[in-house]
Amino acid sequence: MKLDVFAGQEKSELSMIEVARAILEERGRDNEMYFSDLVNEIQNYLGKSDAGIRHALPFFYTDLNTDGSFIPLGENKWGLRSWYAIDEIDEEIITLEEDEDGAQKRKKKRVNAFMDGDEDAIDYRDDDPEDEDFTEESAEVEYDEEDPDDEKSEVESYDSELNEIIPEDDFEEVDINEEDEEDEEDEEPVL
């Protein structure tokens, strides 16, 4: 592979990001590359060993994500941001998401390692059937036939309980003399 951009430069002095940008520019807009293919092309161009690429791979991937000139297109495909207008970037991502919606994915059953073999453990993921019964019954309020106070208002209930303790006939009428209270307030305390 020959990249005209780097003609006359030492390959050992080039960074993987520079080479990745040049490879994608040479391929053109409709030829996005998978990350693994891009890394293989870079390795072939720079002539690096497998161990050297493995060592540089995390740094390259970080640079690829943080460099503003690259854009992830989903499914680990990469392209150059300059290929896409801002509005078109959203459209590309949305069409990729719509394509994925058509394929049904199997749901994985979650396994809790701490619950295995422990019969006394409480599984909080399941709804408690007692809670469901409680909410259904709370909607319908039923009164006890034996206790007529349930149907009365709280004030009536309180009055009837007081009458059981002290019958109404035994209450004494108390006259409140408001003038006396006003006179007491007007007087100043003696020191």
From Swiss-Prot:
GO cellular component: DNA-directed RNA polymerase complex
Keywords in alphabetical order: DNA-directed RNA polymerase, Nucleotidyltransferase, Transcription, Transferase
Gene3D superfamilies in the record: RNA polymerase, subunit delta, N-terminal domain
Disordered as annotated region, ranges: 118-191
Gene Ontology MF, one: DNA-directed RNA polymerase activity
GO process terms (BP): DNA-templated transcription; regulation of DNA-templated transcription
Keyword Ion transport: no
The HTH HARE-type domain, residue ranges: 14-83
InterPro entries to which the protein is assigned, alphabetical: Asxl_HARE-HTH (IPR007759), RNAP_delta_N_dom_sf (IPR038087), RpoE (IPR029757)
Source organism superkingdom: Bacteria
Record's subunit section: RNAP is composed of a core of 2 alpha, a beta and a beta' subunits. The core is associated with a delta subunit and one of several sigma factors.
Function: Participates in both the initiation and recycling phases of transcription. In the presence of the delta subunit, RNAP displays an increased specificity of transcription, a decreased affinity for nucleic acids, and an increased efficiency of RNA synthesis because of enhanced recycling.
Similarity comment: Belongs to the RpoE family.
Protein name as it appears in the record: Probable DNA-directed RNA polymerase subunit delta
Organism, as annotated: Streptococcus pyogenes serotype M1
Lineage, opening ranks: Bacteria, Bacillati, Bacillota, Bacilli, Lactobacillales
